[in-house]
Amino acid sequence: MNLLMALFIDASLSLILISIAFWLPQLNIYTEKAGPYECGFDPLSSARLPFSMKFFLVAITFLLFDLEIALLLPLPWAIQIPKLSAMMVTSFILISVLALGLMYEWMNKGLEWTE
């Protein structure tokens, strides 16, 4: 019985707080707060602004290298596994792929902002 009463009180209190949080901000709407914020850009202008392809390529390269670094993060805990040589070979291959990708991007001037 106490459990049912506690669940009922918790559910009703949660429902009251959620409804207050939903309805209270709608009482006084500020025009500046109601407008969208687009990272400092005017949201009323054209949405088809030219996009820098260099920025896109550098961003994709960053995401790929960041993913490979995320794969390397658990390696210190992998030292505790019995097959230490397999872990070392895997980490060496992963670091080699990372270094080769960085060299390829550097040689093809994929990391340059100016052309």
From Swiss-Prot:
It is found in: Mitochondrion inner membrane. It holds the Pfam family Oxidored_q4. It catalyses: a ubiquinone + NADH + 5 H(+)(in) = a ubiquinol + NAD(+) + 4 H(+)(out). The chain crosses the membrane at residues 3-23, 55-75, 84-104. Its EC number is 7.1.1.2. The keyword Repressor does not apply. GO terms for cellular component: mitochondrial inner membrane; NADH dehydrogenase complex. Keywords: Electron transport, Membrane, Mitochondrion, Mitochondrion inner membrane, NAD, Respiratory chain, Translocase, Transmembrane, Transmembrane helix, Transport, Ubiquinone. It is a multi-pass membrane protein. One of its GO terms (biological process) is mitochondrial electron transport, NADH to ubiquinone. GO terms for molecular function: NADH dehydrogenase (ubiquinone) activity. Core subunit of the mitochondrial membrane respiratory chain NADH dehydrogenase (Complex I) which catalyzes electron transfer from NADH through the respiratory chain, using ubiquinone as an electron acceptor. Essential for the catalytic activity of complex I. Belongs to the complex I subunit 3 family. Core subunit of respiratory chain NADH dehydrogenase (Complex I) which is composed of 45 different subunits. Interacts with TMEM186. Interacts with TMEM242. PANTHER family: NADH-UBIQUINONE OXIDOREDUCTASE CHAIN 3. This is NADH-ubiquinone oxidoreductase chain 3. It comes from Sigmodon ochrognathus. The gene is MT-ND3.
